Amino acid sequence: MSRAWPVNDVKANRPLGETARRILGVRIAEVYSYRPIIHRPEAVEETHALRISLKRLRYTLELFSSVFADAGSRQIDRVKALQETLGDLHDLDVRLDLIRSVADRSTPKPGGGETASDDSVAAGLARYDERERSRRQDLHRRFVEQWNEFQQAGMRRELVSLSQSTERASA
């Protein structure tokens, strides 16, 4: 799991809004540090780390919902959608690892007396693997489209605005 970026200079005697904005700013920077891997479907570990960073961003928005108000709620919906898509992608990655593991254990060893049943198991696993890889490509493409849609709609700009606002966010 990716480590959370540290949030420095948070003090208990500071106003809640100031603390919330400081934490939010760090969480936004953490999420957007993953931009270089957004279009790289092979970046499996980094994509999972992005999902965890999105989760931290969402929890920050939820924890300080009284500070960020309706503008924060809109961002929670976007972040949650991205997080869920990446969760589905991670589930597929785990499934693909499992398929490869089973296939490796199911491959007959040389001189081990391969049977027709061994061939059909290997063929079935190969088809399953191919189908799941195709689903992963489709899901990654959907994630990229979703990410791009949210960015074009101003997600980053709106998040940064929330982190810099000196007043309670409005509708």
Tell me what each language-model feature is:
Residues 1-171:
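Cationic, histidine-enriched alpha-helical/coil surfaces that engage anionic ligands
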